[in-house]
Curated annotation (Swiss-Prot):
This is Thymidylate kinase. The gene is tmk. It catalyses: dTMP + ATP = dTDP + ADP. One of its GO terms (molecular function) is ATP binding. PANTHER family: THYMIDYLATE KINASE, UMP-CMP KINASE 2, MITOCHONDRIAL. GO terms for biological process: dTDP biosynthetic process; dTTP biosynthetic process; dUDP biosynthetic process. It comes from Streptococcus pneumoniae (strain CGSP14). CDD domains: TMPK (cd01672).
Length: 212
């Protein structure tokens, strides 16, 4: 790659994108791809501290706009400190959540103004968008059942939300897919992990023009 390539992974709770990423990493490294994997919120020290505030199960009183602004603050610091330098170094950067999460969760889920969210995303990123977004789609009930069955997963504040919010979030993602289908590729996350990994690999390699 002559320049960096930015990929974001998106999806409702329990879609399994983190597991897919863990399986993809050694495959990419075997290809000799210089890759950085990171996550939102978090990725850097300041971002991780903000993540703790956002996801703390005891912070049930958090206002929706406060939540949004915390995500945006984490996003900016993460980009400046970690993502942009990696892209400038020509690396493949794979982010577990990025700008679309704010639209899906705070826009569709919380009912905040989507134009305002778009403006804040633009402000925080200086207009940076992923070269490719992989959207892992799964029925809300199935995703939440996966979370409930995973005893290793730490419960966070979003896990405690009602079913209705998670359904709105999924609708938000499907709306984004319809609007930005040239950037966002839908992957059926209800399939067995091995199949999801293979599909993801094919889509990613095609997007990056890598030999399969």
């Amino acid at each position: 790659m002559s320049k960096g390539f930015l990929v974001s992974l998106e999806g409702p709770e329990g879609a399994g994108k983190t597991s897919v990423l863990e399986a993809l990493l050694p495959i990419l490294e075997e290809k000799g791809v210089k890759v950085l994997t990171t996550r939102e919120p978090g990725g850097v020290l300041i971002g991780e501290k903000i993540r703790e505030v956002i996801l703390d199960p005891s912070h049930t009183q958090m206002d929706a706009k406060t939540e949004l602004l915390l995500y945006i603050a984490s996003r900016r610091q993460h980009l400046v400190e970690k993502v942009l330098p990696a892209l400038e170094a020509g690396k493949l950067v794979i982010m577990d959540r990025f700008i679309d999460s704010s639209v899906a969760y705070q826009g569709f889920g919380r009912g905040l103004d989507i134009e305002a969210i778009d403006w804040l995303n633009q402000f925080a990123t200086d207009g940076l968008k992923p070269d490719l977004t992989l959207y892992f789609d799964i029925e809300v009930e199935e995703g939440l059942a996966r979370i409930a069955a995973n005893s290793d997963r730490e419960v966070n504040r979003l896990d405690l939300e009602g079913l209705e919010l998670h359904k709105k979030v999924r609708q938000g993602y499907l709306s984004l897919l319809e609007k930005e289908g040239n950037r966002i590729v839908k992957i059926d996350a209800s399939l067995p992990l091995e199949q999801v990994v293979e599909t993801t690999k094919a889509v990613l390699f095609d997007g990056m023009d890598l030999a399969k």
